[in-house]
């Protein structure tokens, strides 16, 4: 059986999905207390690393996504599938789970 090495460059989302690199959560509180992983909030902000071709129209063409690679986005808290690639945290989301583009 062949093995496949997954890295960011080999993951290509399908349809209207995007791969988002999750921003790091805060390590300390404002008072300087270190936070263990079990109490850290899951970040909801990240940068789009890869995108699918978009939604397929009735005529077979694709409607492009509203977001683009390198856009910083805010997404729903419980949306998507968490993925760990090359020791970095990513989330695979549908475009509909993206709430806003951050300028």
Swiss-Prot record:
A molecular-function term among this protein's GO annotations: protein folding chaperone
| Origin: domain of life | Eukaryota
Task: List locations, semicolon-separated.
Answer: Plastid, Cyanelle
Similarity comment: Belongs to the GroES chaperonin family.
Gene this protein is translated from: groES1
Q: Name one GO cellular component term.
A: cyanelle
Question: Which PROSITE patterns does the entry mention?
Answer: CHAPERONINS_CPN10
Q: Does the keyword Chaperone apply?
A: yes
One of its GO biological process terms is:
chaperone cofactor-dependent protein refolding
According to its UniProt record, where is this protein mainly located?
plastid
Query: What UniProt keywords apply to this chain's record, in alphabetical order?
Result: Chaperone, Cyanelle, Plastid
Protein name (Swiss-Prot/TrEMBL): Co-chaperonin GroES
By its UniProt entry, which Pfam families does this protein fall under? Cpn10
Read off the SUPFAM superfamilies from this record: GroES-like
Q: What does this protein do?
A: Together with the chaperonin GroEL, plays an essential role in assisting protein folding. The GroEL-GroES system forms a nano-cage that allows encapsulation of the non-native substrate proteins and provides a physical environment optimized to promote and accelerate protein folding. GroES binds to the apical surface of the GroEL ring, thereby capping the opening of the GroEL channel.
User: Self-association or partners: how does it assemble?
Assistant: Heptamer of 7 subunits arranged in a ring. Interacts with the chaperonin GroEL.
Q: Which organism is it from?
A: Cyanophora paradoxa
Q: Which SMART domains match?
A: Cpn10
